[in-house]
Amino acid sequence: MLDEFLGEKVVVDLKSPFVCLGTLSRIDEHFLELKGADLHDLRDTDTTRELYVADSVATGVKRNRKRVLIRRSEVIAISKLEDVVDE
């Protein structure tokens, strides 16, 4: 199922107070690789996860990493950025 997301801009919700947005470039047994990524620590802002992601959909991904590897065991959910709804 994750293969459907390869090459797409995605939102990765993590167990920790982090959210990551970027282009899913590779998947293996233990890691997801995102390129042009925004690894955001929600403790650094007063906004909620949902508002941060909705703002990123509206204004674009604020890249702060060329490449980031995320442990699959830390992932709660992954979705295409285009599938985020703001209703």
Protein language model annotation of sequence segments:
Residues 1-87:
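Conserved RNA-binding domains used in RNP assembly and mRNA/RNA metabolism
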